[in-house]
Regions:
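Short active-site loop at a secondary-structure junction
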Residues: 1-46, 81-90, 161-164, 233-237
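Hydrophobic "lid"/C-terminal helical patch
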Residues: 14, 176-177, 256
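A generic beta-sheet turn/junction motif
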Residues: 16-18, 219, 230-231, 242
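Short, well-ordered beta-strand elements
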Residues: 225-227, 232-243
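Short, gly/Ser/Thr-rich active-site loops of penicillin-recognizing serine hydrolases
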Residues: 244-262
Length: 262
């Protein structure tokens, strides 16, 4: 499962809609979901950068949600909008962005993703959560005194539209980030607009540092880490089905980078 690494796919589709003049970074959330408190102050930029003032944990529905609109409504019914435009990481921002994509295009999230990213890049091993991926995906494990299967919550995954309901492989993910870097998906100016953030060092699914960027995705027993060291011209992807902490995962992938550089 791609987990939060999926956020950059959602952000890329938002930028594509901006390039088509169907949205702007200043478009207000109230245009699509006016019932959300302070939505008249929350912009697309705020949602992309987690500065919307929205807070939400990861509540799991009792049964799998079967369509995009039900996932968005689940988030709307469980989020809290505070009006404080400070950085606060929450999946709710990207679920709302995914919902905006469906409203602007009048298509499902997966249809837009397939048309604009999966098919052009030939990402044949990337798919949404459904019965086929459930049966074919790598299982996750807990390691203690005994090795046990991790109890995967498909109900939770079904609620994470745009931020945690995709499966992929390291090779497919590499094709995606490489396409961003070589401007196959977005022009230089569009990518610069999407990734511009000077306050939080986070924008559109990636954390930025002096010589590169990284992304982390931990969900449902899957642990995914991406590290792009531009000074060494190295992309590193680590996808695990066994638990490690966020800091351990980043340390592991940085150590891989050191080995490559040596």
């Amino acid at each position: 499962m791609l987990a939060s690494l999926q956020k950059s796919y959602t952000a890329t589709m938002i930028q594509m809609l901006i390039d088509q003049k169907k949205l702007s970074m200043n478009t207000k959330l109230s245009q699509f979901y006016p019932s959300i408190r302070y939505s008249n102050k929350i912009t697309i930029r705020n949602l992309l950068d987690h500065t919307s003032g929205i807070q939400m944990g990861e509540p799991a529905p009792k049964t799998m949600l079967t369509n995009d609109s039900s996932a968005v409504m689940w988030a709307i019914n469980h989020l809290k909008s505070t009006g404080r435009m400070q950085w606060n990481y929450t999946n709710a921002n990207y679920i709302l962005l995914a919902g905006i994509i469906t409203k602007v295009t009048n298509q499902s999230y997966m249809s837009v993703l397939s048309e604009n990213i999966l098919k052009p890049l030939k990402l044949r091993n990337t798919a949404e959560l459904d019965s086929n991926t459930i049966n074919s995906a790598a299982k996750t494990y807990n390691f203690g005194n005994n090795v046990t299967l991790h109890a995967m919550s498909y109900d939770l995954a079904s609620s994470e539209l745009g931020c945690g309901n995709l499966y992929t492989t390291p090779s497919d993910y590499l094709k995606f980030v490489s396409a961003l870097e070589d401007n196959s998906l977005l022009s230089i100016s569009s990518l610069n607009e999407l990734s511009r953030n000077h306050e939080t060092a986070y924008s559109a699914g990636f954390y930025y540092f002096s010589n590169g960027q990284r992304a982390d995705g931990i969900d449902n027993g899957y642990y995914n880490f991406y590290y792009d060291d531009k000074s060494e011209h190295a992309n590193m992807i680590l996808m695990l089905n066994k638990g490690v902490s966020d800091s351990q995962g980043r340390a592991m992938i940085q150590e891989l980078g050191n080995i490559i550089a040596s």
